[in-house]
């Protein structure tokens, strides 16, 4: 009986060791990245760290609406796209931009465009952020670029530290939580901070930086314009006085509600083609 138990324990220990080894390889080799929810984030992240062999005219970074307009998986003649989703926030967009600039210092684009739905600018980390933002970005690599306001917001997410545990990070698991409702009308504190950082990074490299809106459902016109006006009245953001934001607001456009399958995303047949041509000046 003791011999049987001894063999059983050895088998269990060996099986556990093999399982842990496989899990470690699965995590550290990044095999999970194209299998979890939000794999588009890891695709954009990997692409942002990849060396290019030519100079692109435009680098596009944006949310899931931008992903519909300019998929990151597609090759373009003079455009490179790092579009993914809004859950990584403007902070995540900045991290992608910074990665690209550090990886390709000799092939910086002429222009960086953040192609962003106006509602995305309200994101100050959300209930999706544990999975979509913390897992890829809350680590030593990006910590030096995390502002105090972003760090404070991260610490409001319950069990935020769990996001870096390998078997959690390599899964689609997300802590179930809620966050305090926003106290701002439109531009969140995180969006404000990281739009400025993005603009300053581009300026330091003599690269143009532009913020361009994707179309909004016509039946949400009053909703977004009221939020913008309230933001202006409340002087919520110091960016509102800059040309970059004033131009962005003036470019906000609307499409028939029938063109959308949800609050922000286009039906496949109604996705605008070559959307940025109208802003190519």
Predicted regions, residues:
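C-terminal regions of proteins
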Residues: 231-232, 237-281
């Amino acid at each position: 009986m003791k011999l049987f138990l001894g063999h059983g324990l050895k088998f269990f220990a060996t099986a556990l060791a093999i399982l842990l080894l496989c899990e470690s390889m699965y995590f550290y080799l990044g095999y999970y990245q194209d299998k979890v929810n939000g794999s588009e984030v890891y695709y954009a992240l990997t692409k942002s760290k990849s060396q290019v062999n030519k100079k692109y005219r435009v680098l596009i970074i944006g949310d899931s609406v931008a992903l519909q307009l300019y998929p990151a998986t597609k090759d373009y003649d003079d455009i490179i796209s790092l579009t993914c989703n809004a859950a990584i926030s403007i902070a995540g967009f900045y991290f992608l931009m910074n990665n690209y600039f550090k990886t390709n210092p000799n092939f910086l684009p002429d222009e960086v465009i953040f192609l962003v739905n106006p509602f995305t600018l309200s994101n100050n980390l959300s209930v999706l952020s544990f999975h979509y933002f913390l897992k890829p970005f809350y680590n030593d690599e990006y910590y030096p670029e995390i502002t105090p306001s972003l760090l404070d917001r991260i610490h409001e997410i319950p069990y935020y530290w769990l996001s870096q545990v390998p078997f959690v990070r390599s899964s689609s698991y997300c802590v179930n939580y809620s966050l305090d409702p926003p106290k701002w009308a439109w531009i969140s504190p995180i969006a404000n901070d990281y739009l400025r950082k993005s603009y300053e990074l581009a300026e330091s490299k003599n690269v143009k930086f532009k913020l361009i809106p994707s179309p909004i459902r016509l039946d949400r016109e009053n909703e977004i314009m009221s939020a913008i006006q309230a933001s202006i009245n409340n002087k919520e953001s110091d960016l509102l006085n800059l040309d970059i934001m004033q131009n962005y607001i003036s470019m906000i456009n609307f499409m028939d509600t029938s063109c959308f399958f949800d609050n922000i995303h286009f039906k496949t047949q109604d996705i605008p083609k070559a959307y940025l041509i109208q802003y190519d000046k």
